[in-house]
Amino acid sequence: MGKILLPRITWLLLTCLMLSQSPLLAADATITVTKEQGGREIALKVGNILRIELPGKGGTGYLWLVEETFAPYLKLMSEATQKVGEPRPGSPVMQVWRFKAAQPGACEIKMAFYRPWEGVGKAVDHFGVKLHIE
């Protein structure tokens, strides 16, 4: 009897361990949103990471900047600009933000693409997503 139960218990424990590491069940799962998904509503759970990736052109002065506050629902964890392709003036870049869902509620992230010295009134593009955090 013990020889039969041991493999089953081992299989059950390994299955539980794998499921606990699954990003679908993990509280800190990362949800990535791109420019194409702008305007959508996104559902998050407290602890989830929201990663926003927006394309730009290096050397032009244009940046994606956050327009609307999202506190206390999200916490900004990081913001970075990554080079895409060959490093040349004007070559594509990707601006990437990582936010952590901090508490339940609803908020919206709005961003505008403009040169900071010209102001948001001269924005050439906009991005936004509505968030529902459970």
Question: Locations of the language-model features?
Answer:
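Aromatic sugar-binding surface patches on proteins
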Residues: 89-96
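Glycine-centered tight-turn and secondary-structure capping sites
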Residues: 102-107
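Short acidic/polar inter-strand loop motif in beta-rich domains
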Residues: 114-121
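Bacterial N-terminal signal peptides
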Residues: 10-21
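N-terminal edge beta-strand
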Residues: 26-51, 57, 131
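Bacterial N-terminal signal peptides that target proteins for export
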Residues: 2-12
